[in-house]
Amino acid sequence: MFSNQYIQQRIHKANSLREEGKNPYQNGLKRSLTNAAFLEKYAYVKDLEEPKDKEKCESIVGRVKLLRLMGKACFIKVEDESAILQAYVSQNELNDEFKSLKKHLEVGDIVLVKGFPFATKTGELSVHALEFHILSKTIVPLPEKFHGLSDIELRYRQRYLDLIVNPSVKDVFKKRSLIVSSVRKFFEMEGFLEVETPMMHPIPGGANARPFITYHNALEVERYLRIAPELYLKRLIVGGFEAVFEINRNFRNEGMDHSHNPEFTMIEFYWAYHTYEDLIELSKRLFDYLLKTLNLDSKIIYNDMEVDFNQTSVISYLDALETIGGISRDILEKEDRLLAYLLEQGVKVEPNLTYGKLLAEAFDHFVEHQLINPTFVTQYPIEISPLARRNDSNPNIADRFELFIAGKEIANGFSELNDPLDQLERFKNQVAEKEKGDEEAQYMDEDYVWALAHGMPPTAGQGIGIDRLVMLLTGAKSIKDVILFPAMRPVKNDFNIESGE
């Protein structure tokens, strides 16, 4: 692993430090200020002639990002999480320690510098070193020195390198953290209670997806990593909670692309005595709050598309297929005509698909990618909405919506089905679909039906994909850019490096 000549050179330097009685992996030394706090506190020091007050000693820490050796002095750029700060180290101050520094210090090492503030001839605020310590000797050179890390695969597989050399990546994940905390705060302000439900389920449910399967040795039973928390959250509504939410991971054993990762984060929330129309209004308030919190304009650019949050619209499923997808009603309302139309358009569909699933295929191919501004699509076919409440006026549609922004689904919500007999029949239909080969059809969950039989109040529930939300609000083009450690195809790692020296 460490046979590379450049690594061997660095290992030799680490051992050389030990021979001098210095631990190349020290612990216990503390900084007094972050780099940003140092720059702010001593911003008034702008002139080389400022008194060099050694009583104003501060200790700063960070990774060496740039090293310029010049005979009896050197300039070092030290980066912590907050900022880059320049350190000036002179033989006049450190004597023999300066010789050790010149011999051992390299870009990538993590150091502590103790000294006083001063300005260089160019006016740059710096710390004039009185003490210098290597806290952690890095034995693998950083890639491409100060030019960044451009290999996309390497960036995802070795995210730590990506974070070291690409400051903008850190910014994305800091913004992700702000988005998640803002979403949590919004729902708390709206009166929702945050809860936690199981991650391992005896029966996978709450979504149409293929689960990951594991085995519980103590119980001697199979368990499934959850594909959605929905059925457990609705059990809580049965139990008397009236507004709950959960932000956590879901796992779906399916394909990966720029907007899908098998492990992803969602918020799901359930609101008793409300309808899906109330959720639409709540969603509008949520986005208003997020844009304000993130200091974003109502118009944002995503993937070269202008998304205008002031142009939010609501449209029914069939109207969207007709007016946006360009499919006439006489085709949409006849199953055989719709199947023929899809085949004529080159859409690959299975001949045994139900009418509702044919409509879904048409929507996916002809409508979804055109929904740029926030669009709430309502009145979904009941056949593709097994957990949603049946519409009172039209039993063939569900009181359901999905929110699309920039051509992607961002949220899914509906008035919940709380009729246990209807739910039991729909589960039976899903089981029949699974027996026909539909791996994503839902399982029978009699325990959940039994919970519903104890009475669930009229309730509305919704899920929002946090990763896609972060993509939208940060401009990231791939879900891998907003997940710190995304799923990757296994490769043999030979630990080759190209020296940045």
UniProtKB/Swiss-Prot annotation:
Gene3D superfamilies: Bira Bifunctional Protein, Domain 2, Nucleic acid-binding proteins. It comes from the Bacteria. One of its GO terms (molecular function) is ATP binding. InterPro entries: Aa-tRNA-synt_II, aa-tRNA-synth_II, aa-tRNA-synth_II/BPL/LPL, Lys-tRNA-ligase_II, Lys-tRNA-ligase_II_N, Lys-tRNA-synth_II_C, NA-bd_OB-fold, NA-bd_OB_tRNA. It is found in: Cytoplasm. Belongs to the class-II aminoacyl-tRNA synthetase family. Binds 3 Mg(2+) ions per subunit. Homodimer. Mg(2+) 2 binds at E409. GO terms for biological process: lysyl-tRNA aminoacylation. Its main location: cytoplasm. Mg(2+) 1 binds at E402, E409. One of its GO terms (cellular component) is cytosol. Keywords: Aminoacyl-tRNA synthetase, ATP-binding, Cytoplasm, Ligase, Magnesium, Metal-binding, Nucleotide-binding, Protein biosynthesis. Its cofactor is Mg(2+). NCBIfam families: lysS_bact, PRK00484.1. This is Lysine--tRNA ligase. Its EC number is 6.1.1.6. It catalyses: tRNA(Lys) + L-lysine + ATP = L-lysyl-tRNA(Lys) + AMP + diphosphate. CDD domains: LysRS_core (cd00775), LysRS_N (cd04322).
